[in-house]
């Protein structure tokens, strides 16, 4: 049970550290909590505690994630850190812990490395809106010009993946020196404060789900004699009121418009249903056989049906309950997209690969046998014979 009530006085923002292995992500996370504990804005979480991240399950995949929380003068932050590279890939693809912004940690001693690139690419594909950079281990580099070069390299990398590389704040410091310091006025903490200020000013405040256009995936449909057809489901975003017009999207290229005449929850009528509510929507002029599970109700024009898309996919290892063998082009598993369960064919493997192995992270082109409401950045699961074999995120709509 929760020990204390979460008091919502400051805006809440989800962030996380990303970057190459051993560049100092976990050390930085610990240093932030230590510094802010002196200000009464956090509890210090030591390195060892963050490093032994507990297991979580998301979409049938086990992921190790540590969550810490801290505050600045202006905001409340939930911060995630993952111990292993594979955990980052899995987290970003499954969306187990969403990020409103990321802290890219790059060691000045190494510069950008393969996982740095991979994490930045993933952040772009899963729509992480903004990023700040912490250039770590600058105390270990004697030549200031080298640090300048590394910063230029990082900015170029960010620009390459369509982040505003020229304007992203880059903070230089040493997470280890900060973690070892015991006085909040120690010079080693100055970069930590600069980082917090950068988060406050540069990571935009997230748009609350309730302020986005209405969308509800249809879970079940039934008819009420004399009243009409009711579609039930959880409102993913936005809000719905009786009298609102919605579109039924998916399963064909034609979308149908209808009006929600009543919104009900636990058999009581609501003035409005909000993001997160499980509701039933009574639909005007729709027969029970004209709407089914797998479609969505959405604000008109806010989402369209598609069959073909590119996705970044993590394929489960055998030990994770996934496939024991690789798959090639032409593989036809089931795709679980919101409430839709649809067969699809993998028509292209990225990087001209011959096959995809269990444990791989790959870019695939997928063609579904019928259209589904899809948008960039949305998550899905891949299943075969009743077990999850992969998880993906839509990177680009093809048609």
Curated annotation (Swiss-Prot):
Name the reaction it catalyses.
Answer: GTP + H2O = GDP + phosphate + H(+)
Q: Please tell me where Mg(2+) binds in this chain.
A: 26
**Matching Pfam families, A to Z?**
GTP_EFTU (PF00009), GTP_EFTU_D2 (PF03144), GTP_EFTU_D3 (PF03143)
Q: Residues annotated as region G4?
A: 136-139
According to the record, the residues making up region (G2) are 60-64
Q: Which GO terms describe its cellular component?
A: cytosol
Renumbered residue ranges of the record's region G5: 174-176
Q: Where in the cell is it found?
A: Cytoplasm
InterPro entries, per database record = EF-Tu_GTP-bd, EF-Tu_GTPase, EFTu-like_2, EFTU_2, G_TR_CS, P-loop_NTPase, Small_GTP-bd, T_Tr_GTP-bd_dom
Binding, GTP: 19-26, 81-85, 136-139
Stretches assigned to coiled coil: none
The Gene Ontology terms for molecular function here are:
GTP binding; GTPase activity; translation elongation factor activity
**PANTHER family attached to this UniProt entry:** ELONGATION FACTOR TU, MITOCHONDRIAL, ELONGATION FACTOR TU-RELATED
Supply the NCBIfam families for this chain: EF-Tu, PRK00049.1, PRK12735.1, PRK12736.1, small_GTP
Q: Quaternary arrangement and interactors, per the entry?
A: Monomer.
Its recorded name reads: Elongation factor Tu
Tell me the organism's taxonomic lineage: Bacteria, Thermotogati, Thermotogota, Thermotogae, Thermotogales
Q: Which gene encodes it?
A: tuf
């Amino acid at each position: 049970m929760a020990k204390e009530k979460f008091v919502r006085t400051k805006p809440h923002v989800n962030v996380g550290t990303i970057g190459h292995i051993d560049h100092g992500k976990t050390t930085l996370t610990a240093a932030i909590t230590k510094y802010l504990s002196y200000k009464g804005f956090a509890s210090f979480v030591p390195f060892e505690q963050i490093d032994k991240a507990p297991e979580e399950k998301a979409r049938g995949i086990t992921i190790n994630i540590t969550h810490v929380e801290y505050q600045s003068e202006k905001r409340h932050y939930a911060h995630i850190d993952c111990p292993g590279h594979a955990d980052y890939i899995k987290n970003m693809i499954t969306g187990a812990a969403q990020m409103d912004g990321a802290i890219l940690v790059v060691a000045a001693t190494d510069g950008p490395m393969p996982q740095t690139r991979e994490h930045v690419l993933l952040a772009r594909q899963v729509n992480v809106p903004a990023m700040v950079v912490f250039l770590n281990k600058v105390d270990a580099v004697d030549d200031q010009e080298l640090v300048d070069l590394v910063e230029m390299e990082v900015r170029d990398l960010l620009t390459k993946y369509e982040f505003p590389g020229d304007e992203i704040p880059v903070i230089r410091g040493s997470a280890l020196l900060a973690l070892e310091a015991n006085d909040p006025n120690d010079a080693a903490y100055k970069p930590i404060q600069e980082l917090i200020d950068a988060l406050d000013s540069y990571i935009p405040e997230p748009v609350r789900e309730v302020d986005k256009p209405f969308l509800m995936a249809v879970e079940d449909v039934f008819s009420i004699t004399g009243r009409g057809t009711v579609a039930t489901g959880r409102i993913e975003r936005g809000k719905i009121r009786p009298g609102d017009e919605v579109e039924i999207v998916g399963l064909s290229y034609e979308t149908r418009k209808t009006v929600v005449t009543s919104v009900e929850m636990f058999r009581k009528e609501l003035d409005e249903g909000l993001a997160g509510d499980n509701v039933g929507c009574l639909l005007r002029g729709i027969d029970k056989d004209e709407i089914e599970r797998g479609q969505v109700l959405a604000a008109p024009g806010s989402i369209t049906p598609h069959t073909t898309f590119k996705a970044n996919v993590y394929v489960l290892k055998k030990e994770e309950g996934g496939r024991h063998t690789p798959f090639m082009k032409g593989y036809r598993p089931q795709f679980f997209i919101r409430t839709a369960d649809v067969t699809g064919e993998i028509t292209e493997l990225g990087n001209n690969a011959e096959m995809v192995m269990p444990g791989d992270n790959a870019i695939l082109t997928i063609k579904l046998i019928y259209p589904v409401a899809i948008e960039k950045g949305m998550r899905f699961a891949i299943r075969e014979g009743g077990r999850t074999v992969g998880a993906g995120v839509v990177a680009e709509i093809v048609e």
